[in-house]
From Swiss-Prot:
This is Probable protein kinase UbiB. It is an enzyme of class 2 (transferase). It comes from the Bacteria. It is a single-pass membrane protein. Pathway: Cofactor biosynthesis; ubiquinone biosynthesis [regulation]. The chain crosses the membrane at residues 517-539. PANTHER family: CHAPERONE-ACTIVITY OF BC1 COMPLEX CABC1 -RELATED, PROTEIN ACTIVITY OF BC1 COMPLEX KINASE 7, CHLOROPLASTIC. Is probably a protein kinase regulator of UbiI activity which is involved in aerobic coenzyme Q (ubiquinone) biosynthesis. ATP binds at L129, A130, S131, A132, S133, I134, A135, Q136, V137, K152. GO terms for biological process: regulation of ubiquinone biosynthetic process; ubiquinone biosynthetic process. It comes from Aliivibrio salmonicida (strain LFI1238) (Vibrio salmonicida (strain LFI1238)). The active site is at D287 (proton acceptor).
Length: 543
């Protein structure tokens, strides 16, 4: 380890001890060192012994900084790894940190643009509008049009900080995986790999810009969701420029009600937006926490969601969507056998899994949930319980479904915060049934045929040549087969002839031996000579 890594490790250990997180460590030889450090570093005391363990964990991650805050946020979605009281606290982590110097932000923007900021913008506000662990946001106006915009800039020198902490995380995960057998099923190294990929992706604002443009295209002209326009010609890897929007934060219930917002419709539209993204577009905003969602105040009776920060998105293929739709429909029809069989057929649990045992395990977990009124059932928790049960049957983690489950929990939470009587099933069921109807039956066949029509239209002029070539090749193949068959028949005839001559020759040789013992020498000689002749003829027939 380098001196800087040792220093950072000491800082992490100090924070861990100050918040009493050594209580989280299992009783194992590897974990005795941190526990002994509690005695060795006697001057470091547990500052909050009266606080619950989950709260102490959250506060410790906040103190350790952006890498650990985001790691805690990601881990809050992995309820298969953490008990509820810890996962609930991790979900409260807020990605809000002190802003860095505005002049430094301006210098970083000018470095990305390749010239003074005044060449492109006016009214630049050096005081940030918002600040997070990875980036900071300032306001300005476009010089040519006077249009209000926001500039999102990556924090300078954030990458080395992230890479250093990630290296330490890898070291810790490798040690845990190597020395604690019961932790191996949690795959700590894979968890860190997944986290590193997510975090590094957020450092490239071109990716976020691309995601925002895609989501904006998908909802162009929609009354349900608005995504701010990205000004692409002045955006780059470390700078993203987009239009400025004015809205009410979705968690500000008091202001929404004061504005006369139709809360029921707003809540239902949140669910509708989510399922539209999933089943129509196969592309969904996967970070829809309250800080990234606003409400357009202009038409409160017909409220529109506004989605920001598209750094994290999820994509689903046809199989993923079928899995989600059929499982949810199976649940609400209490067809747990179908749910179990779907997992086996998809290959997500081993083919040798006992379907009856799997069905029974799902039924035990889900029956209490579906005993509630439909309006009280949480889709997100249904999926969570399903994933946890399936993992006991060796289901591999599906990252895209974990993202989807996290987003669904966000959407449900927001929806019921806005309108507690929200019936998600009533809103979601039409999406599921419509999508399934499009996948099965005559309509699905005609749709598939229509989709393939341009391809076949392009290939149609080649069809006569293809038919001619196929017929010609078929004729040549038939001729070859006839020759092969004729050769085969000739070979079989030769084999039969050779076998006959061999048998006759063997019989004559045996007769010659008998005649010789009876002193009939002349006849024995003739029989032997004839037998040898037949053998020679059989050998020739076999050639």
């Amino acid at each position: 380890m380098t001196p800087s890594e040792l220093k950072r490790l000491y800082q992490i250990t100090k924070v861990q001890l100050e918040y009493g997180l050594d209580e989280l460590l299992p009783d194992h030889a590897l974990t005795q060192l941190p526990k002994r450090l509690r005695k060795g570093l006697f001057w470091i005391k547990n500052r909050y012994p009266e606080k619950p363990l989950g709260e102490r964990l959250r506060l410790a991650l906040q103190e350790l900084g952006p890498v650990w805050i985001k790691f805690g946020q990601m881990m809050s979605t992995r309820r298969d790894l953490f008990p509820p009281h810890l996962a609930d606290q991790l979900a409260l982590l807020q990605d809000q940190v002190a802003p860095f110097d505005g002049q430094l932000a301006k210098d970083q923007m000018e470095l990305s643009l390749g010239g003074p900021l005044e060449n492109w913008f006016t009214d630049f506000d050096i005081v940030p509008l918002a600040s997070a662990s990875i980036a900071q946001v300032h306001t300005a106006k476009l010089k040519e049009s006077g249009r209000e915009i926001v500039l999102k800039v990556i924090r300078p020198d954030i990458r080395p900080v992230i890479e250093a902490d990630i290296r330490l995380m890898y070291r810790m995960a490798t040690l845990v995986e190597k020395h604690i057998p019961e932790a191996r099923r949690l795959k700590p190294v894979e968890v860190i790999e997944e986290y590193e990929k997510t975090l590094i992706d957020e450092l490239d604002l071109r990716r976020e810009a691309s995601n925002a443009m895609q989501l904006r295209r998908n909802f162009e002209g929609s009354e349900e969701l608005y995504v701010p326009e990205v000004i692409l010609d002045v955006s780059s890897e470390h700078l993203m420029v987009s239009e400025r929007i004015y809205g009410i934060q979705v968690s500000d219930i008091e202001q929404l009600e004061k504005n006369g917002t139709n809360m029921k419709l707003l809540a239902e539209r949140g669910v509708s937006v989510f399922f539209t993204q999933v089943f129509r577009d196969s592309f969904f905003h996967a970070d829809m926490h309250p800080g990234n969602v606003f409400v357009n105040p202009d038409n409160p009776e017909n409220p529109q969601w506004i989605g920001l920060d598209c750094g994290i998105v999820g994509t689903l293929n046809k199989e993923d969507k079928r899995y989600l739709a059929e499982n949810l429909l199976g649940f609400f029809n209490s067809d747990y056998r179908k749910v179990a069989q779907l997992h086996i057929d998809s290959g997500w649990v081993p083919a040798e899994t006992n379907v009856e045992e799997f069905e029974f395990a799902i039924r035990i977990v889900c029956e209490p949930i579906f005993a509630k009124p439909l309006g009280e059932i949480s889709f997100g928790h249904v999926l969570l319980n399903l994933f946890n049960t399936a993992r006991r049957f060796n289901m591999e983690v599906q990252p895209q479904l974990v993202l989807l489950q996290k987003t669904l929990l966000y959407v449900e939470g927001l929806g019921r915060q806005l309108y507690p009587q929200l019936d998600l099933w009533a809103t979601a069921k039409p999406f599921l049934e419509t999508w399934m109807a499009k996948q099965i039956g005559p309509a699905a066949f005609l749709t598939a045929l229509t989709e393939k029509a341009p391809f076949w239209a392009e290939k149609l002029p080649e069809l006569p040549d293809l038919v001619y070539d196929s017929l010609r090749q078929g004729k040549v193949l038939n001729q070859r087969m006839d020759k092969l068959y004729a050769g085969y028949r000739q070979s079989k005839r030769q084999q039969a002839k050779g076998q006959f001559l061999f048998n006759v020759g063997a019989t004559l040789l045996i007769c010659s031996a008998v005649l010789l013992t009876s002193n009939i020498t002349a006849l024995a000689s003739i029989s032997a000579a004839t037998g040898v002749t037949f053998w020679l003829l059989s050998w020739r027939a076999y050639r």
